[in-house]
């Protein structure tokens, strides 16, 4: 089960008043917002934050059904390792082309933020 939390006490002062989504089953936290040191949507093991105290924040999840027409599917046949390696070694993948929003685009032409977003949205395992 996912629980929303606000950190009220921590050894790391940057964590004070930050908001997280806590997944007890996987012992992971997803950052919603923090002063510094953690990016939005960054997932970390709970042990990384050290000794903390927190208060639960109610989460409101309302299922909504919105029909706006057809569906869209981008199919990229490659592995997460390939994309991660392309981020680290772009010179090895000058012709790597992926589908983004219906368009073919060279992976290396994307900004680092866009590359990370593609990897995150394409290969999800939790949260």
From Swiss-Prot:
Modified residues (Glycine radical): 102
Keyword set includes Disulfide bond: no
Top-level taxon of origin: Bacteria
Glycine radical domain mapped to chain residues: 5-127
Gene3D superfamilies linked to this entry: 3.20.70.20
SUPFAM superfamilies in alphabetical order: PFL-like glycyl radical enzymes
InterPro entries: Auton_GlycylRad_Cofactor, Form_AcTrfase_GR_CS, Gly_radical, Glycyl_radical_cofactor_GrcA
One of the record's GO molecular function terms: formate C-acetyltransferase activity
Keywords: Organic radical
A single GO cellular-component term on record: cytosol
Functional summary from the UniProt entry: Acts as a radical domain for damaged PFL and possibly other radical proteins.
Protein name, as recorded: Autonomous glycyl radical cofactor
Species of provenance: Yersinia pestis (strain Pestoides F)
Name of encoding gene: grcA
